[in-house]
């Protein structure tokens, strides 16, 4: 799960991200991230699951993250930086990347605990970013998509990659294991359950906490937010019913334990 600023928005000419304008400009907001975190944690508690939370440094400094004790803590940059320059058009050099990640690492460490894994903002990652991540002592990453087997694999700098699944649905349309389209009303929960049923190996399901209570079109009212939470719970229950066992990132593969292959139906 990505715990970052509300409805993050790449701002042209700025390395740091903003939030979608709700009438007061694009300055970062964090209230939906905090409210959505509470909703998501309630769902996980109800299902007896722990989550992996990739936390942005500034978010960790702004909201109360103490509720995340006991969950797996990862790093998501400091200011939701576009570390490769793909979205903002501003390439960050190696020293700037290292500085941003180090600042985020310290902020998350102070607010919750030392991050043990990493996901790049915008899923924009390259070898230079992995090098900076490795310098922080982090050895697990989840910044890449894969349309093949979902086994963790070794990358450069001694880092193990845990890819996010991506493939085709029954209609031949691209689908990824990010719940973003569901929250925006473009996919039903059943699409993700069917996608998981085709997976070989681990199935990493990704989401944003702010998306529990806000969509790109605006803040959700109480009824819409409740329906949104119910859909999220339906996805998780449906995947568990396939035979998957819940696990945080560092329990996927390797010496830290393996989730058994789900029973096929």
Kindly give the residue locations of the regions a language model identified:
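Active-site beta->alpha N-cap acidic-glycine motif
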Residues: 1-70
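Short, solvent-exposed loop/turn segments at secondary-structure junctions
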Residues: 2-6, 58-60, 79-81, 122-125, ...
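The substrate-binding groove and active-site-proximal loops of carbohydrate-active enzymes
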Residues: 21-31, 50-56, 84-97, 116, ...
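Generic structural signal for well-ordered alpha-helices
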Residues: 37-41, 64-65, 98-106, 130, ...
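C-terminal domain-boundary segment and adjacent tail
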Residues: 45, 194-265
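Metal-dependent polysaccharide deacetylase catalytic core of the NodB/CE4 family, i.e.
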Residues: 47-126, 204-212
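Histidine/acidic-residue-rich catalytic or RNA/ligand-binding cores of hydrolases
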Residues: 84-85, 130, 153-154, 214-221
């Amino acid at each position: 799960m990505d715990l970052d600023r509300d409805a993050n928005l790449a701002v042209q000419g700025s390395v740091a991200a903003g939030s979608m304008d709700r009438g007061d400009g694009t300055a970062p907001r964090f209230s939906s991230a905090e409210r959505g975190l509470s909703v998501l944690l309630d769902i996980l508690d109800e299902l007896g699951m722990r989550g992996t939370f990739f936390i942005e440094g500034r978010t960790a400094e702004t909201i109360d993250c103490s509720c995340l004790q006991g969950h797996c803590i990862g790093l998501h940059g400091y200011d939701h930086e576009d570390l490769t320059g793909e979205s903002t058009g501003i390439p960050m050099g190696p020293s700037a990347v290292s500085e941003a990640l180090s600042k985020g690492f310290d902020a998350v460490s102070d607010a919750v605990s030392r991050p043990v894994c990493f996901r790049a903002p915008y899923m924009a990652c390259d070898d230079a970013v992995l090098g900076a991540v490795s310098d922080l002592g982090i050895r697990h990453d989840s910044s890449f998509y894969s349309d093949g087997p979902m086994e963790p694999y070794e990358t450069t700098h001694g880092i193990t990659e845990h890819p996010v699944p991506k493939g085709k649905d029954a209609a031949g349309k691209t689908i990824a294991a990010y719940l973003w389209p569901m929250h925006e009303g473009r996919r039903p929960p059943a699409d993700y359950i069917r996608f998981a049923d085709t997976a070989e190996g681990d199935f990493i399901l990704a989401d944003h906490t702010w998306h529990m209570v806000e969509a790109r079109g605006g803040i959700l009212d109480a009824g819409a937010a409740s329906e949104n939470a119910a859909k999220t719970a339906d996805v998780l229950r449906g995947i568990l019913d396939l035979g998957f066992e819940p696990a945080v990132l560092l329990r996927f593969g390797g010496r830290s334990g393996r989730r058994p292959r789900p029973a096929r139906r």
